[in-house]
Regions:
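Acidic, PIN/NYN-like endoribonuclease modules and their adjacent C-terminal/linker elements
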Residues: 117-185
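Active-site-proximal, substrate-binding regions of enzyme catalytic domains
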Residues: 2-107, 118, 166-185
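Acidic beta-strand-to-loop metal/phosphate-binding motif
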Residues: 109-112
Length: 185
């Protein structure tokens, strides 16, 4: 297992993050940051498949081998299956799959559910990153500059209608570099 900036890989990605980057045509940011270590649970893929824009993009990324699809089934560990079934009582199928996989593989979940999922991650020592954390990583790794980060954030808010806790990329930089301002993920 490799790590990027203390986030153990692979990255298990929930639909919110996929939609945020997919709708604005910025899967390239995820690819440059995480290479071929992006896992899309089948339950998440099913949620995304209803989108006429992002559904086909995900299918293409899986066919290319850029993203990997993973199904929780009888071949998985008993613990992973039990966690998944338990989590489905509290979360949707996609988020349950992401949480169960991340917990059992000891890797990172990418989600923007900063309430119940965040609490579950904290309780179970699961590494968590959200859309804003990914944008900051891309900035820090010089994949995007500050102006590009602001433009991507603006597109996510205006096109995707992403309910970001901030609309200013400077706030993102300030939080992740100085831990000042509103807590972001």
């Amino acid at each position: 297992m490799t790590r990027i900036n203390s986030y153990p890989l692979p990255l298990i990605v929930d639909s919110t993050v996929i939609f945020n980057f997919g709708i604005v045509g910025k899967f390239c940011v995820l690819e440059k940051l995480y290479g071929k270590q992006i896992i899309i649970p089948t339950d998440v893929k099913l949620e995304i498949s209803t989108s006429p824009v992002v559904g086909p993009l995900i299918d293409d990324k899986i066919k290319e081998g850029t993203f990997e699809e993973y199904t929780i089934n009888y071949e998985c560990s008993n613990r992973e299956i039990k966690d998944y079934i338990y989590l489905k009582k509290r979360f949707g199928n996609g988020e349950s799959a992401c949480l169960a996989i991340s917990k059992n593989w000891k890797c990172t979940i990418a989600t923007d559910d900063m309430t119940a999922a965040k609490k579950y991650c904290e309780k179970n020592n699961i590494s968590l990153i959200g859309t804003l954390g990914i944008l900051y990583q891309a900035y820090r790794e010089c994949i995007i500059n500050k102006n590009e980060g602001q433009a991507i954030l603006d597109d996510m808010i205006n096109i995707r209608e992403y309910k970001s806790p901030t609309n200013d990329f400077d706030d993102i930089i300030t939080w992740f570099e100085k831990h000042e301002g509103q807590e972001l993920f």
